[in-house]
C-alpha cells in the first residue's frame, strides 16, 4: 500500500477522506478527538505544498447528529491555526471551481458527503467508481489520501471509488491503526486476552469465534450485553426483567450463536459470576449462585460485580496482549461505572500491548482519565470487523490502487 512519503504533493490537489463524524449535543460538536487524530496527515500535506480538499460524513440521514460540515471547518481552522474554507457543495460546479482556486498550502472542506444519496449505501468498488461523485471529482484531483479508518468497514464512493482512477494513499492515522491492529491480531505472545463488552453483540460474537478458532486468543472476558448473551447461553437465568429487555433488543436470537461458540470453546470464554443492578436507585450486587438472584426478575443488570472485576483484573495483569472493545456496563451512571473503570485501569496498568476501541470505550477512558493503553483505535465497527477476520473494503481498495499505480510512484 502507498504511504504518504511515496509522492510529491507540491501544487497537487489531494482529496483527503477522513472520518470526522463526531458526537453532537444541541446541534454542537462535543468532542474534537477525531479532528486531532488526523492533524499529522493534514499538516504533512500542507507543509509539502498540497492543495487539500477534506471530505467527511456527519451522522446519518434523519438522525439528530446529521449536520453540515460548517462547524467541522471552523474546528479544524482553530486546530490548524489556518483558514479552512467551508464549501457548501460536494461535487457540483461550485465545489469544483473552489477546488481549482486552491493554492499550494491551502485547504477546503466539502459539505457533508452523506448529503449525496450515492454516499449512503455500501456498493462494490466497480459500482462506486461509476458514481457522479467519483466521475466529477476525479477531474479536479490528483491524489486520494484515505485516513478514515473509522469508516474502513464501509464500501462507499468517497472511501473506495477512486482506487483504480487515482493513486490512493494511506494517511498517518490509517497506517498507525493497521500496524497496531495487526500486531495485536497476529501476536504469538501469550496470554492474549480479548475483552468484549458493550451492545454490539453480533459483531463481538464473530470476533470471539474467529480469534478462538484461529488460535489467536487464549481467553475472552465478557461484559455488557455481550456477557448477558453468553451467560444465558451457559444456562443461567437472568430473570424476567433482563430477558424482556434482551428480547426487545433482538438479542435472544443470538444466544444460539453463543451456545455454538461455547460448545467448542467453553473454557476460554469467561462470563461474570456476579452483576450489579439498579436497586431502588442504588448499586446492589447479585452473586449468580445466591438466592438474591431472584432480584433479577424485577431489576435490570447495569454492570459486572466486584468478584468478576477481581477475576478479570487478575487475568489482565498477566496478559501479554489485550484487545478491548465496549464497556462492562452503563458507565454513564457513576455508580455503574465501576466495572468499566476497573477493567480499563487494569489494562492500562498491565505490561501488555493493548488496543482499545469503540466510541463508548474511548468516552469512558476520557471521562475517568485512564491513561497507559498502548493504542486507542478511532474505529469501533472497523476494529470489530478486522478482528472478526472479515475484509475491510478500504484496505482492499488501498491494495488495488497500489497494484494499479505502483509504476507511477513519484
Swiss-Prot record:
InterPro entries: Phosphoglycerate_kinase, Phosphoglycerate_kinase_CS, Phosphoglycerate_kinase_N, Phosphoglycerate_kinase_sf. Its EC number is 2.7.2.3. It catalyses: (2R)-3-phosphoglycerate + ATP = (2R)-3-phospho-glyceroyl phosphate + ADP. The keyword ATP-binding applies. Substrate binds at residues 19-21, 34, 57-60, 114, 154. It is an enzyme of class 2 (transferase). It is found in: Cytoplasm. It holds the Pfam family PGK. Pathway: Carbohydrate degradation; glycolysis; pyruvate from D-glyceraldehyde 3-phosphate: step 2/5. One of its GO terms (molecular function) is phosphoglycerate kinase activity. Keywords: ATP-binding, Cytoplasm, Glycolysis, Kinase, Nucleotide-binding, Transferase. ATP binds at residues 332, 358-361. GO terms for cellular component: cytosol. One of its GO terms (biological process) is glycolytic process. The keyword ATP-binding applies. It comes from the Archaea. Belongs to the phosphoglycerate kinase family. Homodimer. This is Phosphoglycerate kinase.
Amino acid at each position: 500500500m502507498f504511504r504518504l512519503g511515496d509522492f510529491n504533493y507540491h501544487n497537487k490537489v489531494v482529496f483527503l477522506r477522513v472520518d470526522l463524524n463526531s458526537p453532537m449535543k444541541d446541534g454542537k460538536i462535543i468532542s474534537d478527538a477525531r479532528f486531532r487524530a488526523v492533524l499529522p496527515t493534514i499538516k504533512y500535506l500542507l507543509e509539502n505544498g498540497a492543495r487539500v480538499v477534506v471530505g467527511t460524513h456527519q451522522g446519518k440521514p434523519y438522525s439528530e447528529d446529521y449536520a453540515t460540515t460548517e462547524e467541522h471547518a471552523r474546528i479544524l481552522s482553530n486546530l490548524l491555526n489556518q483558514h479552512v474554507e467551508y464549501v457548501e457543495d460536494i461535487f457540483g460546479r461550485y465545489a469544483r471551481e473552489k477546488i481549482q482556486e486552491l493554492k499550494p498550502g491551502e485547504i477546503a472542506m466539502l459539505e457533508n458527503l452523506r448529503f449525496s444519496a450515492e454516499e449512503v449505501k455500501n456498493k462494490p468498488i466497480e459500482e462506486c467508481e461509476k458514481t457522479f461523485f467519483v466521475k466529477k471529482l476525479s477531474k479536479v484531483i490528483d491524489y486520494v489520501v484515505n485516513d478514515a479508518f473509522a469508516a474502513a468497514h464501509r464500501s462507499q464512493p468517497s472511501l473506495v471509488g477512486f482506487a483504480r482512477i487515482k493513486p490512493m494513499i494511506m494517511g498517518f492515522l490509517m497506517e498507525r491503526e493497521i500496524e497496531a491492529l495487526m500486531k495485536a491480531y497476529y501476536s504469538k505472545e501469550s496470554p492474549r486476552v480479548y475483552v468484549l463488552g458493550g451492545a454490539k453483540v453480533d459483531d463481538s460474537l464473530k470476533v470471539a469465534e474467529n480469534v478462538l478458532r484461529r488460535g489467536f486468543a487464549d481467553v475472552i472476558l465478557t461484559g455488557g450485553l455481550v456477557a448477558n448473551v453468553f451467560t444465558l447461553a451457559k444456562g443461567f437465568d437472568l430473570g424476567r426483567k433482563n430477558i424482556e429487555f434482551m428480547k426487545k433488543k433482538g438479542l435472544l436470537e443470538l444466544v444460539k450463536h453463543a451456545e455454538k461458540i461455547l460448545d467448542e470453546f467453553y473454557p476460554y470464554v469467561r462470563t461474570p459470576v456476579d452483576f450489579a443492578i439498579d436497586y431502588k436507585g442504588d448499586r446492589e450486587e447479585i452473586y449468580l449462585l445466591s438466592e438474591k438472584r431472584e432480584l433479577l426478575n424485577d431489576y435490570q443488570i447495569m454492570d459486572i460485580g466486584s468478584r468478576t472485576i477481581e477475576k478479570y483484573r487478575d487475568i489482565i495483569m498477566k496478559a501479554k496482549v489485550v484487545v478491548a472493545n465496549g464497556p462492562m456496563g452503563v458507565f454513564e451512571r457513576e455508580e455503574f461505572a465501576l466495572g468499566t473503570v476497573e477493567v480499563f485501569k487494569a489494562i492500562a496498568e498491565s505490561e501488555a500491548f493493548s488496543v482499545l476501541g469503540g466510541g463508548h470505550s474511548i468516552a469512558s477512558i476520557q471521562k475517568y482519565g485512564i491513561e497507559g493503553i498502548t493504542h486507542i483505535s478511532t474505529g469501533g465497527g472497523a476494529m470489530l470487523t478486522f478482528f472478526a477476520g472479515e475484509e475491510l473494503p478500504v484496505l482492499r481498495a488501498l491494495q488495488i490502487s497500489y497494484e494499479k499505480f505502483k509504476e507511477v510512484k513519484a
